[in-house]
Amino acid sequence: MSERYRVLGENLKCGEKPKLAFICVHNSCRSQIAEALGKKLASDIFESYSAGTETKSQINQDAVRIMKRLYGIDMEQTQYSKLISDIPEPDIAISMGCNVGCPFIGRPFDDNWGLDDPTGQSDAVFEETIRKIHAKILELIFRVHFS
C-alpha cells in the first residue's frame, strides 16, 4: 500500500494528480462528504470523486446542511449521486465502511475507512463523522504528497 502512495507522490511531482474515489453503496452521504472535503482541502494534491453501486435521487439532506454550516460547501450545487461507472478509473479506491454492505467495484479496495453511516442520526453524530473524514483526507494528503 505505501508503495502505491510513493508512486502516486512521484507522479504528482511530474504534474500528474492521482484520482481518488470514495465509495459507498448509495453515494449519498459519507462518500459525498469525502469528495467535497477532498476537493476543498486537497485539490492541488489529488482529484476527488465519489460513487456507489446504487444512486439516490438526492444527497443526504442532513449532510448537505451540516457541510454548508461547517465548511460553506453547498454539495447540492457541485455534486450528485453517481455510479462507479460514471467516474474515471481511480488510482486509489476507498470504501467508506461496510456497516451497510460493501459494494463490489471490480477490484479490491485500497483502504476501508470503516465509518458508520450517520443517516438518521443526530447532528452530533454527523459532525463526528465529518471530523473523521476531514482527518482521513489530511492523512491522504500527507501519504500522497510526502511518500
Residue ranges and their predicted role:
Residues 1-147:
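Short polar/charged helix/loop
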